[in-house]
Amino acid sequence: MTLPAILIGAGGHARVVASMARALNISIIGVCDPALADQGQTNWNGLAVLGADSALDGYNPAQYVLLNGIGMLPSVTTRRDFHQKFQGIGWQFATLVHPTAWVAPDVVLGVDIQVMAGAIVQLGSVLADGVIVNTRVSIDHDCSIGQHSHIAPGATLCGAITAGQGVFVGAGATVLPSVNLGGGAIISAGSTITRNVAAGATCFGHFGQEPQV
C-alpha cells in the first residue's frame, strides 16, 4: 500500500506534481511551504497548509512520503538541498511516473524521480535520484542522467547520452547521440548539441557553441 504523502512547495511545479500524484491515486494530506505559512494561508490548491518545512517535525517519516514540488526557481540548488537534508534525517521521497508516460521495463529509477505526462524513457536508461523528466521529453536508449538533473518540456535526448549531476536541458533542446554533458551544464532552450559539453558550461544554438569568456 502506498503511504500518504506530504507535498513540498507551492509553485507551478508543485501544482503539476500534486496533479500527477492524484492521477496515481496517492493521498496527499497537505502541503508545506514557508511562503504560505508566512501569509497565514490554511488551504492551497485544495490541500491543507501544514506550515513551513519545520512542520515536518510533527510527522513520522516512517508513515509518510514526501512529494518534492520544488522547481528550478529561485535557485537550481534549492530542490537538491531540500532532498539531501530531509533524506539525511530519514524521510522517503516518492518517485512518480505519470500514467501517460512510457518508461521501459528495464529502466533504473532512483528516488524522487518525476516523469511527467507524455514523456518517454527508453530501454537501458538510468535516472539517478532527484531527476525531473518533464512533459513530452524523449530520452532514448542507454542514457544515464545524473542526480538532480532537469530535462525540460519537449527536450530530446538521443541514445547513449551521459549527463552529470545537476544538468539542465532547456525546453525543446536536442542532444545528439553519445554526447557527454558535464555536471552542472546548462543547455539553453531550443539548442541542438552535437558535441561534449564541459562541466558548468552554458551552451546554446545549433552547434551547441560555448560562449566566449
Segments predicted by a language model, with ranges:
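Structural signal for interior beta-strand "rungs" in well-ordered beta-sheet cores
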Residues: 95-211
